[in-house]
Structure formats: C-alpha cells, structure tokens
Amino acid sequence: MSASTTSLEEYQKTFLELGLECKALRFGSFKLNSGRQSPYFFNLSLFNSGKLLANLATAYATAIIQSELKFDVIFGPAYKGIPLAAIVCVKLAEIGGTKFQGIQYAFNRKKVKDHGEGGIIVGASLEDKRVLIIDDVMTAGTAINEAFEIISIAQGRVVGCIVALDRQEVIHESDPERTSATQSVSKRYNVPVLSIVSLTQVVQFMGNRLSPEQKSAIENYRKAYGI
C-alpha cells in the first residue's frame, strides 16, 4: 500500500528534511510535463551526493522492509531507476538481514544491444523471478507501464512497485472516479504500489513552514487534481 496515512516515521522525516536542504522538494509555481501548474515540485535527481544517496537508499529500503513484500529482483527503468535499483539493493543487504542478502538488481537499456551479452536487460536475469519496480515518482504511470511490458517479455513477474513520492493526483481530471496513477497501476496489474511518502504526508511535515499562500495554492491544486 502507499504511504497515504498522515503519521510520519523518522526515516520519512529525514528524507523530507534532506529533500528541502538539497532543493529536491520546492514550493512555488512549476509547470509539469502534464501541462498542469503545480504549487510544488519534486526532483529526486538532486539527491546526488554520497550522504544524500545513502539516506535516500535507507528511506526506500525501510519502506520496502516494512511492506513485507516478497521479491527476488529490484528493477530500475532507464534512466532514473538505474541508480535507485543499485543503491537500494546494497542498502537492503546492509540493513535488511539475511533474507535480503540475495536480492539482485537489473535495469533495461533504451536500445537493444546486438553484440557482447546482447539483449535489453542488464544485471540479473528476470526469468521466473519476482520483480519489484523502483522509480522516482509516478505521475501518469507511463514509465511503469513500459517497465511491466519489458519485464513480461523477459519472463519475470512483477509483484509490486515503489516510488519516492505519491503525488495523489488524478491522471485525467475528467475521470469521474478520480483515479490516480498509483491506483490505476495497482488495479490494472493487481500489485501494491508503495511510496516513501505521500503528498498528504509532505503537507503535514511542512506544517507552518508553508506560508498561507502556499497552503492555499496546494489546497486549490488538490481540489482540482487530487484524489
């Protein structure tokens, strides 16, 4: 399940605090790929130092461990998912105990390689493996849908997905059921979609650090696009 409740654990607070420090999490006015004008922006690529990556890996790994999801391979869709799969695989082995020591990781090439080891999958074989997809955020679910297809062709079985932030917003504002990307993926493939934090938790964490104008902008955005 997604991190949709309002309670915050220490690893989530640390993740968000560091996100503010490195400006991965910002508030203002930002145009998204979807064309929406968002009052906040989340750019996980700004977790780009050793300290930040170590803490990011801890946040992902802790969320995974707490989910009790059983899997064999972490799959990172190219490109942003590649370093995430690697660092979280290491962190799981470090803090997760013996049952995570054998977890492997893999990722896809953007183009099929026709020489050397060939193929599109790099790293662990996905054949007959239970696969957890890892990515940064899920807005429309396009990258995740592509990952499902790649894994299926490689004869793996997706058992779940995890992202850093669940934006908790609809894919299409005209949708009468107000279905979010995470809900759509979960329903379509019958797998859990985990997250380190949800937008609800971000707002709770920020509290009075948000100005009245920022709070109002987020509230209006959620009325228009929230689930």
UniProtKB/Swiss-Prot annotation:
Catalysed reactions, as listed in the record: orotidine 5'-phosphate + diphosphate = orotate + 5-phospho-alpha-D-ribose 1-diphosphate
Annotated orotate binding sites: 41-42, 139, 167
Pathway: Pyrimidine metabolism; UMP biosynthesis via de novo pathway; UMP from orotate: step 1/2
GO BP terms, alphabetized: 'de novo' pyrimidine nucleobase biosynthetic process; 'de novo' UMP biosynthetic process; pyrimidine nucleotide biosynthetic process; pyrimidine ribonucleoside biosynthetic process
Pfam hit, one: Pribosyltran
Record-level GO cellular component terms: cytoplasm
Protein name in the entry: Orotate phosphoribosyltransferase 2
Species assigned in the record: Saccharomyces cerevisiae (strain ATCC 204508 / S288c)
Gene of this entry: URA10
